[in-house]
């Protein structure tokens, strides 16, 4: 979760505590909180089935700031890693550089590289951890901020209304940059079968006209495995 900045409910001193508690109550007693971590307002929390909680070990958390001068935490990631039996898992929740222009596109790619480098030090005391290949299963999610480029806002809205997802994905910056091997090497994404999710007005699913920004697939979930690892996505849908 990114941009999680709000006044916490009564009884909570910080939004982080409020959010983590809300998730615990929502999931119910069959799930236990394994770990939670925040980089300013970028939050990641991991819950585990009570039946499997005792099978988990080596829990670690880390954060990497990629905002202004590489130290401001409005952009970057929060991450959690652990072992489940003999398999190593890593979850990375990130918020990358915004805006559509090509300079900002390269900034997003650089954020990706900086996060990998930063997590190598964050998860390892000697800084020698190879996050890209250390974990059996890695899930990278959040507001990656890659945009739809090369067609106008009106065209994007028209294609979305027609259900022409294929055309929109041809102009998707993340797909383009992955194809050029500029970011998210060896990561996979489930098939996108829905229209852009950025940016709707809250509550009514109409396109926001604030700053007249182009609709895009900003929020994504990607995954990678080591050889012999298998991930079978059951669903990939917008909320």
Residue ranges of each PLM-predicted region?
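Hydrophobic beta-strand segments of well-ordered beta-sheets in folded domains
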Residues: 1, 89-90, 138-140
